[in-house]
């Protein structure tokens, strides 16, 4: 009897997507034998109602650009095309309907898993997918409250990179080369993303630094 398809689901704001996300998805794909990883940019993040978030189309397009070269990566619009706040339960339910024969593996930050009991329709989550928490080396998950066997942890050194840090660097006029894919550096510059209203200095994008 053949094994069911295994599909990874990586949800996130991706504002912007960076190498930490990509390395984490690639590592989990290899370790768990996933056929593909579907990146799902959040539509309206319910946890970030008081934060300024870039338009969904910009975040979607950056994710498409960043993942285009990996044949095992795909990008889904299920969250950004759904009206209202984005909840993981809705994301997984929609993907379950699209891939009824597959086992879903939801990839997220291990720190987020510590708050999972506060998530919308939490009782459904572990029925819809196995959860994989990606974390920095040495991180200890306080997971006594999580169902046994429902969560796996994977250490990813590149998780030290954060979207918040990338936005702060752009706002301060600092480069984000090598923190995000080259195409994302160019997209941010073209769209003028993450620049504060009082940022008169702009960002010195210039050519990509050489390896010499």
UniProtKB/Swiss-Prot annotation:
Pfam (any one): CTP_transf_like
Which molecular function GO terms apply here? ATP binding; nicotinate-nucleotide adenylyltransferase activity
The question of whether Nucleotidyltransferase is a record keyword is answered with: yes
Q: Which residues form the signal peptide?
A: none
List, in alphabetical order, the GO biological process terms annotated in this UniProt record: NAD biosynthetic process
Q: Which keywords has UniProt assigned to this entry?
A: ATP-binding, NAD, Nucleotide-binding, Nucleotidyltransferase, Pyridine nucleotide biosynthesis, Transferase
EC number(s) from the headed UniProt entry: 2.7.7.18
Pathway recorded for this protein: Cofactor biosynthesis; NAD(+) biosynthesis; deamido-NAD(+) from nicotinate D-ribonucleotide: step 1/1
What is this enzyme's catalytic activity, as reactions? nicotinate beta-D-ribonucleotide + ATP + H(+) = deamido-NAD(+) + diphosphate
Give the EC class as a word: transferase
The yes or no answer to whether the keyword Aminoacyl-tRNA synthetase is present is no
**InterPro entries given for it?**
Cyt_trans-like (IPR004821), NadD/NMNAT (IPR005248), Rossmann-like_a/b/a_fold (IPR014729)
Q: Which family does it belong to?
A: Belongs to the NadD family.
Role description = Catalyzes the reversible adenylation of nicotinate mononucleotide (NaMN) to nicotinic acid adenine dinucleotide (NaAD).
Mind telling me what this protein is named?
Probable nicotinate-nucleotide adenylyltransferase
**Origin species:** Saccharopolyspora erythraea (strain ATCC 11635 / DSM 40517 / JCM 4748 / NBRC 13426 / NCIMB 8594 / NRRL 2338)
């Amino acid at each position: 009897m053949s094994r069911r398809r295994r599909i990874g689901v990586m949800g996130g704001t991706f504002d912007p997507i960076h190498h930490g996300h990509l390395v984490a998805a690639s590592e989990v794909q290899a370790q768990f034998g996933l056929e593909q990883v579907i990146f799902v940019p959040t539509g309206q993040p319910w946890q970030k109602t008081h934060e300024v978030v870039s338009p969904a189309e910009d975040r979607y397009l950056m994710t498409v650009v960043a993942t285009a070269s990996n044949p095992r990566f795909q990008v889904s619009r299920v969250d950004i095309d759904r009206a209202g706040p984005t909840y993981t339960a809705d994301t997984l339910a929609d993907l379950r309907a699209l891939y009824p024969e597959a086992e879903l593996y939801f990839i997220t930050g291990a720190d987020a898993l510590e708050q999972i009991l506060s998530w919308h329709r939490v009782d459904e989550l572990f029925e819809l997918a196995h959860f994989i928490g990606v974390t920095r080396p040495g991180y200890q998950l306080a997971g006594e409250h999580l169902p046994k066997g429902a969560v796996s942890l994977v250490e990813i050194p590149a998780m030290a990179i954060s979207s918040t840090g990338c936005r702060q660097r752009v706002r301060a006029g600092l480069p984000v080369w090598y923190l995000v894919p080259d195409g994302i550096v160019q997209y941010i510059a073209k769209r003028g993303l993450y620049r504060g209203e009082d940022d008169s200095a702009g960002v010195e994008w210039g050519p990509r630094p050489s390896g010499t």
